[in-house]
Design a protein with these regions (language model features):
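Bacterial Sec-dependent N-terminal signal peptides
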Residues: 1-23, 27-30
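Extracytoplasmic Ser/Thr/Pro-rich, glycosylation-prone low-complexity segments
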Residues: 20-254, 260-266
Length: 266
């Protein structure tokens, strides 16, 4: 009966719209699914090596205001952040963290860090950095996911996190499924938060266990965490810890009642 209802819903979905599908909760951010929460078929980024920004800026699909400035696209980083500085496309993305944010004149700036740390994307299957836009105006969402990316120098440890930008409210959400600690490399440093274009304004997450900002030189880990950043004017954000409910970023697999694959994709 459940599969019958799902198939009818699937038919209606293809007839009526290209909207997202909500079926049941899941606790994993990435992978291949036949039951998903807020399913989002995303585009694979061009990043297939470490310490680089994506070759081109990617469109958000809507206007998003960050520290009071409007943007329509962003650049992805191999090291766990996005920046609205479009001149960074195809440029080096720093991995060394030797000073806290803000650090004027040094990347990342104009950035959302989820977190910024030294991770090691590479050729498949380690190039799984995806992005996409879902929903209908004026309530669209832009999502970036770093899925099971090895930590540099601790490649047995895999990092998974996600950034979601909301149209209209300009809210930011971050979901950290697995944020390991590689204490033997880069001082174990990782920075989670926001910084504006000139490093004048910044908002850093306070670790709920350690009671300190997740900024250099703090060593920290996270599992199945959710955070929201709500604009408080144009110079700061209110940060709240929220329930871990990421958008599933992967390939949707459609099957019939007998389990036969009908197709993949949105």
């Amino acid at each position: 009966m459940k599969k019958f209802i799902f198939i009818i819903s699937l038919i209606l979905f293809f007839v009526s719209s290209n909207a997202q599908i909500i079926i049941s909760p899941d606790t994993s951010v990435c992978g291949v699914y036949n039951d998903t929460l807020q399913a989002l078929s995303q585009e694979l980024s061009s990043i297939n090596t470490d310490d680089i920004h994506g070759a081109v800026a990617v469109p958000l699909g809507f206007t998003f205001n960050f520290y009071g400035t409007a943007y329509n696209s962003c650049v992805l980083s191999a090291n766990g952040y996005i920046t609205f500085d479009l001149t960074q496309a195809g440029q080096y993305s720093p991995w060394g963290i030797s000073a806290p944010i803000p650090n004027p004149g040094t990347m990342p700036e104009n950035a959302i860090m989820a977190p910024w740390q030294d991770i090691l994307p590479g050729p498949p299957p380690n190039n799984n950095i995806t992005f996409g836009t879902t929903g209908l105006a004026p309530n669209r969402r832009f999502t970036v996911t770093w899925c099971e990316i090895p930590m540099f120098s601790c490649t047995q440890d895999l990092h998974t996190s996600q950034i979601i930008l909301y149209e209209g409210s300009d809210k930011i959400e971050m979901f950290l499924q697995d944020k390991p600690l590689c204490a033997t490399w880069n001082g174990g440093a990782a920075v989670q938060g926001l910084v504006d274009a000139t490093s004048t304004n910044f908002d850093i997450v306070n670790d709920p266990v350690l009671g300190q900002p997740r900024n250099f030189p703090l060593q920290w880990t996270a599992t199945n965490e959710g955070w929201e950043f709500i604009p408080n004017g144009t110079t700061s954000y209110t940060i709240n810890q929220i329930t871990y409910v990421p958008i599933i970023a992967g390939t949707n697999v459609w099957t019939d009642a007998n389990g036969n694959i009908l197709g993949t994709g949105p």
